[in-house]
Amino acid sequence: MLANPFTPAFLTQLETLRLRTRKEFLGSHPGNYSSPRRGTSLEFADYRRYSPGDDLRYLDWGIYARTDRLYVKLFREEVDLFAYVFIDASASMGFPSREAKFFPASHVALALSYVILANHDHVKLHLLQDQSRLQDQSRASPFYRGRRRMTDCVSFATAAMPGGTLDLAASLNDHLQRLRRPGKAILISDFLMPAAAYQKGLNLLRSFNLDIAAIQVLARQEVEPVFPNGRLALVDSESQREIAYRWNSNARRDYQARLAHHNLELKSFCHQSGIHYSLYVNDRDLSDFIFATLPAIGLFK
């Protein structure tokens, strides 16, 4: 699964990236992200009046010379980041095959996980799927930290089998009830669901004070379907509902217009909600997506 494109050169390039976050979080170890707590990093935050016992090194003698009052400088504390990567593992992520869609989605998740691990931050992987299909221990990984835990991330993602239906908000809520730390949430899905369904799920993530990115993964066959002209029996991969449909050039244009409108609604909702959004089609080079597109939308520093 990781033979290509996870080459040593690709991993080395991933180590040059760092997630960008729009929020401030409280971490458990010193790290690279701003915290609302006051600390001793080099990023100046504010002043306050001197109190006995304060470190004299942080007295601002310039203010003292002007006001004859003692003030100490305050700095933002830099802390580590907790990142939650949610991967849609419903049946639609297995269309047209697990290798063609779920694997590319997993590759995106694993590339982002490696960036997080290489910065010595914490990452936790979550599978979004019908709860009846998953044991508690297979729904989410533990927190991983450090590059050596990449093999654990790979093992977790490789073991997943897409299947079943997905109620996005309900599945997210099941995971979020166990969440104890705010941080960065990255949701990877095809988002092929009614607008009300993905909006409810994304709003739920927002309610947990998470900085959110939404990455939509589609197969080329979904973007540009190739079917013989004539009558077709189309089967919903999740509900198994079947409909008869007559396919021709007009039907193709109508389908592509509807998909483009759906994707534009998703993108607009994300932008209005302060959520990073990007579309990844499975035949695109992963390296180009990671190193060109994701920095362009502000996901990386």
Q: Each PLM stretch: what is its role?
A:
Residues 103, 162-169, 192, 257-260:
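Conserved phosphate-coordination/catalytic loops
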Residues 1-36, 177-183, 195, 199-301:
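Von Willebrand factor type A / integrin I
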Residues 149-183, 195-196, 218, 223:
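Von Willebrand factor
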Residues 142-156, 295-296:
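Short, electropositive alpha-helical surface patch
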Residues 107, 111, 166-173, 196, ...:
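Short, contiguous clusters of charged residues that form electrostatic/catalytic patches at enzyme active sites
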